[in-house]
Regions:
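Phosphate-binding site recognition
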Residues: 1-456, 471-472
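Structural signature of nuclease core domains in nucleic-acid processing machines
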Residues: 435-556
């Protein structure tokens, strides 16, 4: 059979029946049920690490309403024959996802939650017609289905539905909740900008999950997924036999994401072993517990691209699946001295940091340690060493893909913190031909922003372009002019003036003067000013950079 890629597949049965490649993670079923005493299990992983597909697989395996023998045929779990006889398709399963329960107001989010509960009720509509079900429960069930239930009944809804399922099937219910923390994550974000509904949303979820998880005689066990663990005191109050597994824990560490061996098998099946090193450079590097893993979303997207174009280049598939709010928070907090740490990370170094996986959303921004913890839990950073344990660990950027997010996002965010008065001072000096003042101001700006890539020339070019943008000028970067490409061209049409800048990176501080001269000579020799007709004043500058120092020279 030809190799088929499933990108973003979350329906396990469809994935298997369509013949698309599946990285076998079914052994988690046995380990979870037979090798733990957990009544409630929480797995926290970054977005796009296969949590939803995992939960859908569990639903297909356990659900009493399915016959799943065909779709599990040949998978690892079938080696445990006694386990499969005891558990496969033997339990009612209540599976709900909160992935889309997010809005800008409590009312909007609550409405979405009602809709998700209504969808679940429609999936189980047959329960409403069962005479074995308590009449009062049927009444609430109908109100849930038509989104007219009282808030108190919404908070009790999961337990009510589970009680109805138990009445019909005579078996305890397996509860699966995917992306449990999305509603409160969004609520916390909106509360931070003056729309406070975090406490209201938390109260609803605490009631909804608390009644389902605490002292519920109809619960066989529950599995929950999310990005962050919310402290037990905050939402899992009173839950017995509760265990959570984050990116710091060794147990279950290889079940989310692709291991190196799994990627090797995958590339062999795809006949693309030639891309192993490139995929490793771009998408590997995450350390979960004691396992090194790749991001499955990225690997499958890239393999899909390679099927369409044999020489497709790897790119950033992850950046549009996760917002950068936590990075913005870091940069805006002037009381956090993080610029130096970001520079170390972006230059492929490591930082030592105290981290915790036991957080509450309303206190995420209360300390620098918490924010580094969030970057770790959400996949922006990873442990530097799989053998490290404890709360103090070395952190690094996992791979080239995430490094590109830092370069695109963090550097720009720090640039945005440069106030307009500093930009204006720089422009005044340049328009006035004040080389000394321009050198000083540009050097000062360099000290305020992030440097990376060992101060490559591209870094300085991007720095200048970023500073000039937003000042009301037309900014052209590396556009063809004359016989070559000037680094920066500014046009001030209102005042009929223009500026050409050529930037050089100096290898030594004592080379800066001659590098400035070389930059000015390049402007002249390559006729960068040709074509700038109608401007009454054209300034031409060579700027040499050495680390965080700038030297400016004007063409006389």
């Amino acid at each position: 059979m030809a190799f088929r890629v499933g990108v973003g597949e979350t329906d396990f049965a469809d994935l298997r029946r369509s013949g698309k490649y599946y990285v076998d993670k079914t052994e988690i079923l046995y380990e979870l049920v037979e090798e733990t005493e957990n009544k409630v299990t929480l797995f926290t992983r970054p977005r796009r690490f296969g949590k939803t597909l995992m939960m859908n697989m569990m639903s297909n395996f356990f659900s009493i309403r399915k016959d799943s023998r065909e779709i599990f045929e040949g998978l690892r779990i079938t080696k445990h024959k006694a386990f499969c006889e005891k558990w496969m398709n033997q339990c009612p399963v209540l599976f709900i996802s909160f992935k889309d329960v997010e809005a800008e107001t409590f009312e909007g989010a609550y409405k979405m939650l009602q809709t998700r509960l209504a969808d679940v009720c429609k999936e189980w509509e047959s329960l409403y017609k069962e005479e074995r079900v308590n009449a009062a429960d049927r009444k609430v069930f109908k109100e849930l289905m038509f989104e007219t239930a009282k808030e108190s009944d919404v908070r009790s809804s999961l337990k009510i539905i589970m009680r109805m399922m138990h009445a019909v099937y005579g078996r305890k219910v397996i509860l699966l909740i995917d992306e449990y923390d999305v509603p409160i994550a969004r609520a916390n974000e909106m509360s931070a900008v003056g729309n406070p509904f975090y406490s209201a949303m938390l109260a609803v979820l605490r009631g909804l999950m608390g009644t389902a998880l605490k002292d519920n005689e109809f619960l066989e066990f529950a599995v929950i997924t999310g990005c962050l663990r919310i402290a037990k005191e905050s939402i899992f109050t009173g839950t017995n036999n509760f265990s959570s597994y984050s990116v710091l824990d060794e147990d279950f560490s290889g079940f989310f994401g692709f291991t190196g061996d799994e990627v090797t098998e995958l590339l062999l099946a795809a006949d693309r072993e030639d891309k192993a090193e490139m995929i490793k450079e771009w998408y590997d590097g995450y350390v979960f517990g004691d396992s090194f893993v790749y991001c499955p979303w990225d690997v499958m997207n890239y393999l899909s691209a390679l099927k369409k174009r044999r020489n497709a280049k790897p790119k950033n598939y992850w950046k549009n699946t996760s917002h950068n709010g936590v990075l913005l928070t870091f940069v805006k907090r002037t009381d956090f001295k993080v610029k130096g740490k970001f520079e170390i990370l972006m230059n492929k170094g490591t930082i030592i940091q105290t981290v915790s996986d036991d957080l509450t959303y309303d206190t995420l921004h209360s300390s620098e340690d918490h924010l580094w913890s969030v970057l770790l839990m959400t996949g922006y950073l990873t442990k530097a060493d799989e053998k490290e344990e404890g709360e103090t660990v070395r952190l690094r950027i996992p791979n080239r893909e995430i490094a590109s997010i830092f370069e695109d996002t963090v550097v720009e965010l720090f640039r945005q913190t440069i106030d307009n008065s500093a930009r204006k001072s720089m422009m005044d000096a340049l328009w006035n031909g004040d080389e000394q003042e321009a050198s000083k101001v540009i050097s000062d700006l360099l000290w305020r922003t992030i440097s990376y890539n060992d101060y490559h020339e591209d870094y300085y070019h991007a720095f200048l372009a970023g500073v000039f943008v937003g000042l009301g000028y037309e900014v052209e970067s590396n556009r063809e002019k004359g016989l070559g490409r000037p680094d920066i061209l500014l046009k001030d049409d209102d005042n009929r003036r223009a500026m050409i800048i050529e930037a050089k990176r100096s290898m030594k501080e004592e080379d800066m003067d001659q590098d400035c001269d070389a930059a000015v000579s390049q402007i002249v020799n390559k006729k960068y000013a040709d074509g700038l007709c109608g401007y009454t004043r054209i300034r031409c500058y060579g700027i040499a950079f050495f680390q965080k120092h700038a030297r400016v020279k004007r063409m006389q």
